[in-house]
């Protein structure tokens, strides 16, 4: 395999990468003979890195196939590669499995946390000699499966907070139900079993996390949404249509969109939203994974999910940077109560971990048929998530860590209840102490 002269080739590209993006490219190229997973937050420009590498490899004479999970994301990547002077087109995994294509040298895979799915594994078996380069913001699966079966190296980019501080992502205000007991904590494996329960399950049980839709969605948006361009994520198509109708009946231009609509109709609706003709666009997850919607400044989350990937993908739809912008996230599902804050520092790894959910099919079954008001709790209001990095609770946190049991866990929850939603600062004494004593803070 030839050595890539990426410095000379890269200068001729239309796409110009930032320094942090170029560092990720360099790290991929240093391991270009191995399968690499590139991890960087939503909105950090992974698609640009993918398009950059695609042309770089293609110009060196390699056959490169590019894959993305949805038609909308494929179209975005096609446009980006075209803009960069490439004639390559993205492929659908299933159609490629059934097709008769030449064996590629490289597979570039967007939203690569899907790599353990059966269809992707069939693709990898079809092209056993191809080198894989995957891209993901959240390399964690709900079923707990790792990605080490598909990738050899994990290459991690900047944190969310670093990207915010460098004006790559927008800063934000986050509103969550007042019932939330806040950020959860986990313990490394040797501390997991306590009275027959894992700490993760104990935290979830003690925190009061339930699959509900809290507060009045319309009223909250009017009070806290600041009349911003908004994407609403609903638990089902029926619910999405119902929310769009409710907003429209109250004088707010809102539309529903889903994958069953004609392509021309979807494009027209998205175009109207981008032009500002539609204020609120409602969907289930069409405008979620990998979708670039830089016009959105507010996100409404009404879909409870145990999937960290889904939570992060949806929350970040409002985080694209624009000067003077502050994104607003209205978390009616209290997903922050289960997953933690969106700018927490993750310790990503290729290996698997314990499944996040006891009932992984819950959303597909219950929420898919959802048509009842029984899961609404409009007696609760959303409150702004307040961060506290001043070490006020360090001694109590130290005590809880030393206990290392359910009693200690309850102390943590009591602390968080007092402070509403409080996270421990990355550089605080408590953070360092917790890591040293085997705690992962925040939980992934």
Language model feature labels by segment:
Residues 33-52:
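Walker A/P-loop
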Residues 75, 242, 252-284:
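Conserved helicase ATPase core of P-loop NTP-dependent helicases/translocases
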Residues 154-231:
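Conserved interdomain linker/interface between the two RecA-like ATPase lobes of SF2 helicase motors
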Residues 67, 71-103:
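Inter-Walker segment of RecA-like/P-loop motor cores
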Residues 279-283, 289-304, 310, 317, ...:
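A short beta-strand element within the Helicase C-terminal
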Residues 117-174:
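Post-DEXD/H (motif II) to motif III coupling segment of the RecA-like Helicase ATP-binding lobe
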Residues 317-346:
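Conserved segment of the helicase C-terminal RecA-like domain
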Residues 3-37:
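Conserved pre-motif I regulatory segment
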């Amino acid at each position: 395999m030839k050595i890539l002269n990426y410095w000379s080739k890269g200068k001729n590209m239309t796409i110009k990468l930032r320094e942090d993006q170029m560092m990720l490219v360099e790290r991929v190229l240093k391991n270009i003979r191995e399968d690499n997973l590139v991890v960087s937050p939503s909105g950090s420009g992974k698609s640009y890195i993918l398009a950059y590498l695609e042309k770089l490899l293609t110009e060196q004479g390699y056959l490169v196939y590019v894959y993305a999970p949805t038609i909308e994301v494929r179209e975005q990547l096609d446009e980006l590669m075209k803009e960069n002077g490439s004639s390559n087109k993205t492929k659908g995994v299933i159609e490629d499995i059934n097709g008769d294509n030449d064996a590629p040298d490289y597979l570039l895979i967007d939203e690569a946390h899907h790599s353990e799915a059966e269809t992707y594994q069939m693709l990898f078996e079809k092209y056993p000699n191809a080198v894989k380069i995957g891209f993901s913001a959240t390399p964690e699966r709900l079923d707990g499966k790792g990605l080490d079966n598909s990738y050899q190296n994990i290459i991690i980019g900047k944190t969310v907070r670093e990207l915010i501080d460098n004006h790559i992502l927008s800063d934000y205000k986050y509103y969550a139900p007042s019932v939330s007991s806040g950020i959860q904590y986990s313990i490394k494996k040797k501390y997991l079993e306590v009275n027959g329960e894992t700490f993760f399950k104990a935290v979830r049980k003690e925190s009061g996390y339930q699959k509900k839709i809290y507060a009045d969605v319309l009223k909250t948006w009017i009070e806290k949404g600041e009349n911003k361009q908004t994407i609403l994520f609903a638990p089902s198509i029926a619910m999405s249509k119902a929310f769009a109708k409710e907003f429209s009946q109250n004088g707010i231009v809102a539309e529903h969109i889903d994958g069953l609509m004609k392509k021309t109709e979807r494009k027209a609706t998205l175009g109207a939203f981008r032009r500002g003709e539609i204020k609120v666009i409602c969907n289930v997850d069409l405008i979620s994974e990998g979708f670039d919607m830089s016009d959105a400044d507010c996100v409404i989350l009404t879909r409870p999910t145990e999937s960290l990937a889904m939570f992060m993908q949806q929350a970040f739809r409002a985080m694209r940077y624009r000067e003077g912008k502050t994104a607003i996230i209205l978390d009616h599902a209290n997903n922050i109560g289960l997953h933690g804050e969106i700018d927490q520092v993750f310790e990503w790894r290729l290996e698997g971990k314990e499944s996040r959910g006891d009932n992984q099919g819950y959303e597909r079954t219950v929420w898919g048929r959802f048509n009842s008001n029984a899961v609404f709790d409009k007696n609760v209001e959303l409150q702004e998530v307040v961060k506290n990095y001043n070490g006020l609770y360090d001694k109590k946190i130290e005590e809880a860590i030393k206990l290392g049991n359910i009693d200690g866990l309850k102390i943590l929850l009591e602390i968080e209840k007092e402070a509403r939603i409080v996270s421990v600062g990355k550089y605080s004494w408590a953070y360092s102490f917790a890591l040293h004593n085997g705690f992962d803070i925040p939980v992934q």
